[in-house]
Amino acid sequence: GVRLESQSWGADHAPEVDYTGSSMVEVVKGAECIRYGFGAMGGVVLLNDAPLPYDSTRFHVKGSVNAGYDTNARGVSGSGTLEAGYKRWGMRVHGNYTKGGDYHTADYILNNTGYNNIALSAMLGYKDKNITATLLSSIYYQRSGIYYGSKISDLDQLIKRFEAGRPDVSTLRNFSYDIQPPFQQSQHFTVKGEVKWRINDDHQLDIVGSFQENLRQEFENRKKQQWSWIPMQDLILKTYKFDVTWNAKWHLWNMTTETGLANTYQENFNYPGTKQPAFVPNFAALSMGGFTLHKAQWGKLQAALGLRYDFRVMSVNGYTSLSNYTYYDDFKLYSNFTSSLAAHYQISDQWDARANVGWSWRPPDINELYAIGLQEGSYWVVGNRHLESERGYKAVLGTKWRNTKFSVEPSMFYQRIDSYIYDHIGNGKDRYHNHPSGKYPKFIYDQDDVRLVGGDIEATYKPIEPLTLVAKGEWIFGRNLSRQDWLPFMPSDRYGLSASYTKVLGNRQQYVASLSLSGIYVAKQTRFDPDKDLVPDSPDAYFLLNGTADFAIKLPHKREIKFMLVGDNVLNTLYKEYTDRFRYYAHERGANFSLRTLIRF
């Protein structure tokens, strides 16, 4: 795959990615994160495409169709994939469409929260004994509404809204698919070419080049209705990437080496005519890096060492205000090393242990430096041009024990970050911002030295072959060492318990039925400072019950029909998530039931 480059500075900016077009999800942790540059040492999630159908002696076509309906927001969705292969050639085309209207919490509707998404992609490939070449092109469009009830012009009313934590009943309307200002829309185009050259049995060279273009427009309510259809933000981001990677195998100690160079050039431009200062300025940025990842094995011990150097240079210019035309022209240069050492030891057939320690850094993002404006339609953001790079280290320890019926896997981590970048609610006069569309809480970027400590545990039990029980727990403690208080907006403790049952039926085992039920309990967050929040208390603890039932019919020639019923928050719990900034205005989504049909042919 290729790293998505978009205007990802908004918590409400969903990644412009069609998840239905990816057949494999890969989670990368440990020393292997060194491949993906600064900011990736915590782990990387990859959405990978399945290999194209090469080597068919005759022209062969197969595909799939997926259709679904969601009760919450009355959403409809449909996707289809068609792929063909003949000898050394393979191709795949994919399309997806989703549409939904206003969604409901457990108690009330949230108007103007509809969405429309359209995605198209095509992939062509060639493969012979030594060369594999692919060309991928995709386009993704999304339009999503923003709940308008966060527009409140009176400060006393805004504070009362925070205390109530839910909309005024008089502002609620009937369900609709219409999307009116405030809303946002974006379009993302990607083209990627990749060549894998198998030099010999032990050496391979990978070359990847890509271009991405991201268009984003954001609309807000203005004084006059006709002005509301003029975008407040109108941006285009262009990204050019070129990566080269060499992979080698060595016969001594089963060693492997992966060495690569990564180059990225970006240009961001704000179209004029918005009558509003740009949220992020115009900029050009060049990032270059080189890495090496070396692995070896000595009996039961496996080890990996990764080293990387990156630098990033940015040229920035923009206006902080249109009223006095305050212009700035800035230049930033960041560089540093990243390293990681990982080990895995097989103590016995049933027990293994792993450890990883890494030193990493991250330069501030463009929004953290220069942002000024409304985000998520609900709070005002102010960047900090004086931010430095984050630097720190992280140590992870874990182990796993298993037998034929039971397994348990605990892990823990300790992380120290100097100059950690985060945003917090302003104090005094900086607590709220007065804007023509309303009054909003103000979040200001800052940095301090912090410590993060946490862990998780997962236990799996199979009392009988078709039944699997899984229990999980997750904890994280974030402490601000510079100010000697808790870090704001850190996740609460989470606990989960799930059960899944799968049964193969029929004389020819052509039917597969499965049921799963899962419960998630999220504790009340007590590790926070009430004086540095907009409300004096954190949301209550909550419990969510989810379930899935599906029935598959296997047909000749690897064809299949599957029916699925998925339930989220089936008890229709009214709850809030502590880390969600929108919790000051409303609750999370209520119950949703999805009915889906998948046909493979």
Where would I find each of the regions flagged by the language model?
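Short acidic/polar hinge/loop motifs at secondary-structure boundaries
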Residues: 3-29
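Gram-negative outer-membrane beta-barrel transporters
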Residues: 413-416, 435-525
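Outer membrane beta-barrel strand-and-loop segments of large Gram-negative receptors
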Residues: 233-245, 289, 382-388, 394, ...
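Short strand-turn segments of transmembrane beta-barrel domains in outer membranes
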Residues: 44, 49-84, 95, 110
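Periplasmic-side early beta-strands and strand-to-turn transitions of outer-membrane beta-barrels
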Residues: 46, 81-181
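C-terminal beta-signal and adjacent terminal beta-strands/loops
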Residues: 361-362, 416-418, 423, 469, ...
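Surface-exposed extracellular loop regions of Gram-negative outer-membrane beta-barrel proteins
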Residues: 150, 265-269, 311-322, 331, ...
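Face-selective signature of the C-terminal outer-membrane beta-barrel domain
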Residues: 127-141, 175-324, 328-340, 344-346, ...
